[in-house]
């Protein structure tokens, strides 16, 4: 898809992605825009509390090519997306709209709630956390959580 927008072949697109990705990563580090990758460091990150510790948690999935190995197929298959996927958990500061935390990649069949618990995210004191229905039952200690109610009708 990236190559189609610029009239590049798959080989050219692959070359440029691998050539420019390290530059992008270095730039993000230089301007301090990389998210935490360690759940225990979230509470001490200054950007977490910027504008108040109003945070939102979300699970994000991206499609994969179907694995050939039947065992890997079962691990990667997401019933929610009806496809083979990988998943990450994101934590966003609702005030600054910055991604504060990006979890390790997990298999698509793992539920958002379980992936968040396994990430062992440590939240700052008096934080508020907005979550969707995928995190029902996820109640981190010392955090005020809110979940939207389903509309009736």
What name fits each language-model region?
Residues 1-153:
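Short, well-ordered secondary-structure "scaffold" segments embedded in the functional core
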